[in-house]
Amino acid sequence: MVRLSYVRFGVAWCIAIIIVSGFSNAASDNFYTPKNGWRSSSAGDILAWRSIDASGIKANVDLTVAYQILYRTSQNSPKNPQHSVTTILVPKNSVKNKLVVVGEAQDSNNANSVPSVGFVSGSRDSPNLVVDESLLVPYLQAGYIVTVPDSEGPLNAFTAGRSGGYQTLDSIRATLSFDKLSLNKNTTVAGFGYSGGGQAISWAAALQQSYAPEIHVAGWAFGGFIPNVTALVHHADSSRASGYAASAITGLVDAYPDLEKASKSLLTSDGQDMLDFVRSNPITEVVSKYANVDVLGSKFFKRDGGLFLSKAYRDVARQNMQGTSQNEVPHVPQYVYHAESDEVVPYNSALQTVQYWCRHGAKVEFVTYTDDKLNHNNTQVTGSQPVFTFIQRLLNGKKVSWDACSFVKENTGPSASSSAGGPHVVPIPTGGHHTQSGSAHGGHSSEHAASSTHAPAGTGHNTSGTGPHASSKPSPSLHPSTGATSPAPSSHRETSGGAAGFGARVASRRRAAPPRTMPAPPLMER
């Protein structure tokens, strides 16, 4: 069976052709099981490798070869050995010593939804891969070798972001040391991802300096990322995106033995059935089944909201919360984007995290998409072209134009893609599916509303937890005192033709007056 997915990337149409035949299964494929003694190897060591026929990508770009590497990595902590797989795509006339690592939005706890299975066997259980493959095409056409790790690892632990960071960084190590490629330890690396893939990339950015300082990273780009799992669960619960809340809970339970043990006394039989369903089905089925369901309620937990009262959960949530440690502030340039109207990952949690990073020396351009027609899904393609421009500039040795942090608002609407499924392909139930098409940030004018802001302590945007992005459910205390703020825009306007380093953007900007300090948000014991 051949499935076509059309995505407009700038002015060019990308056609992802997924050839489905003879489905592989990670659980039954011996390649995914390392040989005895693998735990004594070092992080990033290659345990096994194989050549593959990446049928979906080959239909769109001329690949010289594709490989998969089984490599040693870490789970939850550098002290806990783990293994994972990365898929390497080598285009014809590949550029030497430049590597792009991609955070694939698996967003699923299902073993057959991992990127490496989707590349080999098609995307039956990896619906997000349909679009993400399309978005790889410009990078491959530019000659960049691309590595796509299974960043959820063999536990398929969606939202276990810290592990995703380790597994992403170790996929880079393994790829750079692979002797079949024209790469070496001095290779320049850049990475991008969205949603769960954005979470893995953002954690790679946060952990790189302490965990893999030898990697020469030029910068990172990510959107729709998950810096606070509890905020996602509260935000998505009892909405049409409730399936993401169920998947987030399941991922943490599967990744942390103490939480898995505690869950047995917290879950009802329906709750255990919910986790089993999440593990056994692709995210499309999970989102459909649990749409508008209160997954935190008494049907699934023996005590309403009891999950958040568990010490085991609070400990795990803190370990996977970003914007809480000065030792985990990314030190290379970042391009981050998020839709204010994101119905899955609350906008404020992303904003608060970036503000924290900025107060501690990060270099970030944070783009807020303000059009209320944008959702979690279609924001991915809307932001894909500026992400490509950012990555390409960095790999070409060009510096970004911001010295500290820049907060920008754009009213760019969604591509004429599905408001239901969107370019990210997971259909949040709204009663229909649409063909993916339209402009991906290339055909609209945009309003930039805010500022080259250096974000000293106590500056930023409104994070008061009110408005359309705040959860209506009461939540336990969660975010540390970040001194969140709200800007007071002035009427001054400045016209810029790609001033933030993206020549493709021609837009109007207005500078914001110094933000005023607002009360710190609660720590969402998320």
UniProtKB/Swiss-Prot annotation:
This is Secreted triacylglycerol lipase LIP4. One of its GO terms (biological process) is lipid catabolic process. It catalyses: a triacylglycerol + H2O = a diacylglycerol + a fatty acid + H(+); a monoacylglycerol + H2O = glycerol + a fatty acid + H(+); a diacylglycerol + H2O = a monoacylglycerol + a fatty acid + H(+). The lineage of its organism: Eukaryota, Fungi, Dikarya, Basidiomycota, Ustilaginomycotina. Its main location: secreted. It is an enzyme of class 3 (hydrolase). Residues 413-423, 430-457, 480-490 have a biased composition (Low complexity). It comes from Malassezia furfur (Pityriasis versicolor infection agent). Residues 412-526 are annotated as: Disordered. The gene is LIP4. Belongs to the AB hydrolase superfamily. Lipase family. Class Lip subfamily. GO terms for molecular function: triacylglycerol lipase activity. The keyword Lipid metabolism applies. Keywords: Glycoprotein, Hydrolase, Lipid degradation, Lipid metabolism, Secreted, Signal, Virulence.
